């Protein structure tokens, strides 16, 4: 008979032999992104590396909460979500870990990554002003700040202040203009609303085409998606809308990102870094740009023809992690302004 000690050694060897290859050949991703392009990139990565990518999809808030609950027992290796504010929330909750990667530092510009190496941008979206081409001309538009001018009374359609995209836009304005001026701006926009804030970005375009307001604020990704929608009605609507990049005479148009970070308790950290590095590569960045109407973060990769048709623009180079750092201040400002 074998001794108990020998059995333990054998059992440990069996466990190690069966688990190590598994960990060496997989990476587990919690993602808020839900696009066909992401599945294509997963398949490409697995084919190139032999590393299997397991995906759990959900809303950003749900995934962050799940990571909190799971703690050290979480199977997640990577968190991918949209908006720097959400990534900063995950960082502040202690759910991410710092990584060191020369590839990521080279591919992702400094202002588009966390200064502590906790997360990196993968794509960009510009938050632009869209306008009903039958009632507004580009020369009537200028800056985000101008949206508070009384000339736009009853003419603005916009999302709720609960929306992270609006929170990040206001956070950027607080960074540039200060708290008091940003509060005055938010109050001014509220006075100019054509209706109570509601719906998603696409709904704002639908509103101004339907005559509920003349201008709205949207992320460029939604414009691209509507332009290539399977719904002919959405294509018809977006053709009646013009795209304007604000603040070209000063700091540039506000941009936000989708990004990724390695989770604090990752069991496959090396594979996680490899996957994020792959997503920052020219091959992956080209697919993001051409198929999903997003701006690449990697220099030298061209946007799609549709995205280029909206024109080139100067983008705000504010360090993107600032949006998360000022998120709570932005939420307070919206509340004070009565922006619901």
Regions found by a protein language model. Give the residues of each.
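Periplasmic solute-binding protein
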Residues: 84-95, 112-142, 170-171, 255-260
